[in-house]
Amino acid sequence: MHAWPASEVPALPGQGRDLRIHDTATGGPVTLDPGPVARIYVCGITPYDATHMGHAATYNAFDLVQRVWLDTKRQVHYVQNVTDVDDPLLERAVRDGVDWTALAEQETALFREDMTALRMLPPQHYIGAVEAIPGIVPLVERLRDAGAAYELEGDVYFSVEADPHFGGVSHLDAATMRLLSAERGGDPDRPGKKNPLDPMLWMAAREGEPSWDGGTLGRGRPGWHIECVAIALDHLGMGFDVQGGGSDLAFPHHEMGASHAQALTGEFPMAKAYVHAGMVGLDGEKMSKSKGNLVFVSQLRREGVDPAAIRLTLLAHHYRSDWEWTDQVLQDALARLDRWRAAVSRPDGPPAEALVEEIREALANDLDSPAALAAVDRWAALQQESGGTDIGAPGVVSRAVDALLGVAL
């Protein structure tokens, strides 16, 4: 599966700063020091109802991570998956009377278009769950043969007790885990499981649903968590720098994925930092496919909204915050974009070197994009009020906003 085209990242004078970011697993900030090649895995979409603002906010956060690393002159090895076979996708295809593979392809193509328009840097490896199945099967077999998984009526479940570190990502109590498991694709009430929290690794073939050769597992399809584990281990190995996604993935998805990987390899941790973006709401509730309260990037683009304004709307909120999408936040972003473009359209202006350092400092401090935007606002206001004589300063600002924030002025 191919990703989307990369926009050019302008080179900036000076050197970026190491990223200090909130790690869900430790509950506090950690300073990331990846070495010459930074490794990041971000969980991708299930391809239906793409791309809503919750999606866009998540991928904006991890695009900023990449940009901070690139500014430190590191290479970035970025992997993202597509959950292109899953119960919600199959259910949507049945509801709409379409082939599930056609729906997945259509929505993945739309997602690529939206990411291109928003100037999100693409992953080097963009991997669908279906294409990863040949690598998933032997991992499930290994877990089963090692006693870390067991069969139940043809299905295969992971035993959470096989990982002594289970619970170390989300730090939730058992009752909360059980509740969230039921809400987020698990089956804690299924009779016969050793532990209600045990997640499915391999689902035996069901009538009328797609299935694949599972070797000694029999025909079926993989569980959600093992898909990401297989892709991450194949392309990044253990101990990569950042595992990213929305805050609703901390449990069960990232918790279970970490336990799968740690049980498979005997190594700890799967990722050095678990980073989670907040939720975007509409009309007082979290945007979600199940509720249908969605604002789509493609819809706004069709209405003629500049993608740079959409991106500024996302950047106006700290990535870990939960926030509400309203017409006003978009109007504020459009006005900000106009002010910035007017400010950089002049041939000279106030000196820009300090501004570049302010943006760098803000982003290195847990991706504080609102602080970065405020710094640019101050420069633009100074340009509007009194101007300046620094030839080329507007060009420096334009390149910095592009390179560090992904906004084309």
From Swiss-Prot:
Cofactors: Zn(2+)
Induction per the UniProt record: Gradually induced by thiol-oxidant diamide, under (probably indirect) control of SigR.
Gene Ontology process terms (BP): cysteinyl-tRNA aminoacylation; mycothiol biosynthetic process
Residue ranges of the motif 'HIGH' region: 45-55
Cofactor note: Binds 1 zinc ion per subunit.
InterPro entries for this protein: Cys-tRNA/MSH_ligase, Mycothiol_ligase_MshC, Rossmann-like_a/b/a_fold, tRNA-synt_1_cat_dom
The keyword Metal-binding belongs to this UniProt entry's keyword annotation: yes
Domain of life: Bacteria
Sites where the protein binds L-cysteinyl-5'-AMP: C43, G44, I45, T46, T58, N81, V82, T83, W224, G246, S247, D248, V280
Short sequence motif 'KMSKS' region: positions: 286-290
Gene Ontology cellular-component terms listed: cytoplasm; cytosol
Record field: catalytic activity: 1D-myo-inositol 2-amino-2-deoxy-alpha-D-glucopyranoside + L-cysteine + ATP = 1D-myo-inositol 2-(L-cysteinylamino)-2-deoxy-alpha-D-glucopyranoside + AMP + diphosphate + H(+)
Motif extent ('ERGGDP' region): 183-188
Region (Disordered): 1-27
Pfam families xref list: tRNA-synt_1e (PF01406)
Key words of the record: ATP-binding, Ligase, Metal-binding, Nucleotide-binding, Zinc
One term of GO molecular function: ATP binding
Ion transport keyword on record: no
HAMAP family the record matches: MshC (MF_01697)
Role summary: Catalyzes the ATP-dependent condensation of GlcN-Ins and L-cysteine to form L-Cys-GlcN-Ins.
Family: Belongs to the class-I aminoacyl-tRNA synthetase family. MshC subfamily.
Alphabetized NCBIfam families for the sequence: mycothiol_MshC
Protein name as annotated: L-cysteine:1D-myo-inositol 2-amino-2-deoxy-alpha-D-glucopyranoside ligase
Lineage of the organism: Bacteria, Bacillati, Actinomycetota, Actinomycetes, Kitasatosporales
Gene name of this polypeptide: mshC
